[in-house]
Each structure stands twice: as structure tokens, then as C-alpha cells.
């Protein structure tokens, strides 16, 4: 939701304790959104560049364009047209339902927004490709990334753990078909790794039945919530993310910052993880390759250490201040002459 923008210093001061509480009690979510967008619209000056996230309405975008302002949209995931096909195919393969909420109306709405905006930030190569596949003009797309904060980086250390120590492998995110967790659990069970797989995140209703066969397995832990996610990364040995559809998941950037060797799908980390440099980038459905990657990291502490050092080093280029500078340069370059 777009934040309510208020000029009055007095109102700003009391907003958290009084103003917003009253609004939330008196108005529905849809009316709060309308009010937020109205107040936001009132603050726009003639030469402002407007940056919108997916939750903003088509009506707001239309009003801003009629004012003559340049609008930049953030596309946090693949184009919905592409996402729906990927998830529909997996839904059919698994014989499950309600994997996603993407409708033709929401696809048409996204197409209309992308047609009307001036530029769109894409956080990953596959998001960029999905936009191109959906006929978004190449010169509208600003290819970038997401990132991490410096405090989320871990100082590199030499691994002195014995080579036969059980590994701690982590998955972090919503546990659903979209993230490919059902595939990961199958691969993990068949790989027979000396270690534990920690699946950290809430399990979506659509995948509950698929999780049941794995709940009694000793070396698989389902953890619904953790209060200190950074500690989880620090204590882990390997990060895994076999996503079928993503934007550019922040959890992958955190894995680099923690110096974790990564095994990810292209959706889970392409553009962030470099294959055979700081991890492996493997098609989510390539079962044999996933098992081989898990075994390779289990059997070689040297490879884990090599990937770990490369991961931590590569995280430097994804620090938010650098990503912000890169995004600013991209946009300024496009705006030259406008």
C-alpha cells in the first residue's frame, strides 16, 4: 500500500498514535487505499518522477500520467502472464489446486500498467525475459537487482569444522509449490546426505498434503518461524532454493552475505549466484543434478570453503548503496534529453 503523505508537522507527529488508529478503525482496507492514493496524488509536483510498486491502482497511474509525470514501476516478480503458465503447469503435474491467485483480470491489469508507465525496474534476468515475452518494449526495461545491507554480511572465517560433521542445509521462504519445496524434499531424501535440512517458513495450505510424507523424517525439520534469521544463516553450511517462479529473492542475497555455498534454480538465484563460482545454478526439475550438487558439497569441504569465500566476496557488489547508485545511473541515462 502507498503510505499516506501528510505535510503538517503536527499531524505527522501524531499519525502513528492517533491518526492512523482512527483511520484503521473507521475505514475498510479498500477505502484506506483510496485515501492513501488521493493524498499521495495531491503531493505530486509537475516535474516529479513517480516510483510505484505493484499494489498501486490503475486509476492512480492513469491520473498521474494525465498530470504529465514520468512513472517508473517496480516489477518484483515475473510478468503474471508467465508466472501463471509456470504455476498452472506445476499444479497440473502435482494434481493440486489453489497454488496461485493470478487471474486473467490481474494479467490484463499488469499489461495495462506496463503499457502506460514510462519505465520498469526488473530485478533479475528472468524477470526481464518474462517482460520481453509479454511484449514489454525493451527500451522501457531497467535491468537491475535487489541487495542486502552491510550489517547482513558475515565476516569471512576459515572453516575448521571436521569434514565428517553433519551438514546444516537451509531453505528460507514460504513453503509452497512456487518455491519448489516439494522438489527439494524429494531430492534431499534420495541424496541421503549426512546432515539436516531445515525448511524455514510457513507452509501454504495448497501443499500441506505433499509435506506429510516428509514430516516424520529425522533429518528434515519444518520450522514455521524464527526470531533471528541472521543467526540461522550464520549457523548453516549450505543454502538451497529450487524456486519455479520468483523475482529476485532477498534470501539469496542474504546467503551470499553469510558466505554460504548456494544451490539454486535459475529463478531462485540467476544473476546473483554464479554457477560453479559460489554455488550451483540448476534447473528446478533436474533431479539428478540437484542430488549430484548436494553430494558434491557434502563430500568436499574444500569445495564448500571455496564457494563460501566466493559467496561472501560477491555479496559486496549487491550492497544496497551500490544497487541504488546503479539504479540511479540507469534511470538518469534514460532521462537524458527528456
Kindly label every feature range from the protein language model.
Residues 244:
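Aromatic "clamp/platform" in nucleotide-sugar-dependent glycosyltransferases that forms part
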Residues 15-26, 71-108:
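Acceptor-binding helix/loop patch of EC 2.4 sugar-transfer enzymes
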Residues 208-226:
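Nucleotide-activated donor-binding/catalytic signature segment of Leloir-type glycosyltransferases, i.e.
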Residues 93, 98-155:
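Donor nucleotide-sugar binding/catalytic pocket of nucleotide-sugar-dependent glycosyltransferases
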Residues 261-264:
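Short hydrophobic beta-strand element within catalytic cores of glycosyltransferases
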Residues 149, 157-179, 185-190:
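Conserved donor-binding/catalytic core segment of Leloir-type glycosyltransferases
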Residues 114, 225-226, 232-236:
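Short alpha-helical donor nucleotide-sugar binding micro-motif in glycosyltransferases
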Residues 275-276, 280-287, 296-301:
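Conserved acidic donor-binding segment of nucleotide-sugar-dependent glycosyltransferases
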